């Protein structure tokens, strides 16, 4: 895996010495998040924040759940946007408007229609093709009661077939039969839903083992971090609970577990 720092130019002022330039660069690097970019054949995937992902192939860009809390100055304009759910850190109208190319489809689940009136609704089980990209909508829902609750049929995961690869962005879900039945996955983005106890590590291991993707990225695993922060407050230290447990259980099954830096420190 390679890490890429996309940093802008200093807009004004002259730095007099090499030492000062070095100090200034260090400050800028502390402010700009590292963007982790992996290549799978001709497909390039960049991870941003929580559940925000960029997929590129042959000059086409897919944005999944873009969120303004990420540094979107390093995101590319999208030919296709996929939204998994209607919650603000999945469906961010401002981020969609910023990254959407003119005429680019925005795929939403039915619950996103009020916020994206011109969105393309995909129901669980639907398949659509956008140029050379095929998208299958997979059910994503909760079984255990409690809030927030995701009823069956209101949110999607997506299997994205592009560049000869099958990439499964699972969305917010428990280990339901629809998820467990997906096969032939090259790359999976699989949620933990902590601390809500709806997708604990043991359930995730069971589901991923059945799916048997070649590579899996745990994502969407810190619900405390994404909660709104009061004025003057600070976000909590990101959790890492369950990540090493997944790695220890899945690596012997020839499933590569990659840990991305989803939450800025």
State what each model feature region is.
Residues 69-72, 87-91, 113-116, 126-129, ...:
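Active-site environment of divalent metal-dependent phosphoester hydrolases
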Residues 159-228:
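Metallo-beta-lactamase
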Residues 1-29, 33:
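Intrinsic disorder/low-complexity segments
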Residues 56, 100, 251:
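Anion (oxyanion) recognition and catalysis
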Residues 93-100, 157, 179-180, 204-208, ...:
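Short amphipathic alpha-helical segments and helix-helix/interface helices
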Residues 63, 68-114, 183-189, 212-213:
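Active-site metal-binding motif and surrounding structural segment of the metallo-beta-lactamase
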Residues 36-76, 119-183, 259-265:
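Core dinuclear metal-dependent hydrolase active-site scaffold
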Residues 120-129, 205, 209-265:
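Binuclear metal-ion centers of metallo-dependent hydrolases, dominated by the metallo-beta-lactamase
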């Amino acid at each position: 895996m390679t890490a890429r720092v996309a940093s802008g130019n200093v807009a004004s002022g002259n730095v007099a010495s090499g030492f000062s330039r070095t100090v200034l660069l260090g400050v800028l690097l502390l402010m700009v998040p590292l963007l982790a970019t992996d290549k799978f054949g001709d497909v390039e995937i960049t991870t941003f924040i929580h559940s925000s992902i960029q997929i590129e192939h042959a000059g086409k860009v897919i944005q999944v759940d873009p969120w303004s809390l990420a540094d979107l100055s390093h995101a590319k304009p999208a030919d296709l946007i996929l939204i998994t759910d209607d919650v603000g850190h999945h469906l961010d109208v401002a981020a969609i408007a910023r990254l959407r190319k003119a005429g680019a489809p925005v795929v939403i689940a039915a619950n996103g229609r009020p916020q994206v009136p011109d969105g393309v609704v995909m129901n669980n089980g639907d398949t659509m093709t956008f140029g050379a990209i095929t998208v299958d909508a997979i059910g994503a829902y909760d079984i255990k009661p409690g809030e927030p609750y995701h009823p069956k049929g209101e949110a999607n995961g997506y299997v994205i077939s592009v560049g000869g690869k099958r990439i499964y962005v699972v969305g917010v879900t428990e280990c339901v039969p629809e998820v467990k039945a997906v096969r032939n996955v090259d790359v999976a983005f699989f949620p933990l839903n902590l601390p809500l106890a709806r997708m604990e590590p043991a359930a995730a291991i069971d589901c991923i083992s059945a799916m048997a993707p070649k590579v899996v990225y745990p994502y969407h695993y810190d619900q405390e971090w994404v909660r709104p922060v009061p004025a003057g407050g600070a976000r909590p230290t990101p959790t890492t609970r369950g990540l090493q447990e997944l790695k220890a259980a899945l690596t012997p099954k020839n499933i590569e577990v990659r840990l991305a830096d989803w939450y800025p420190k």
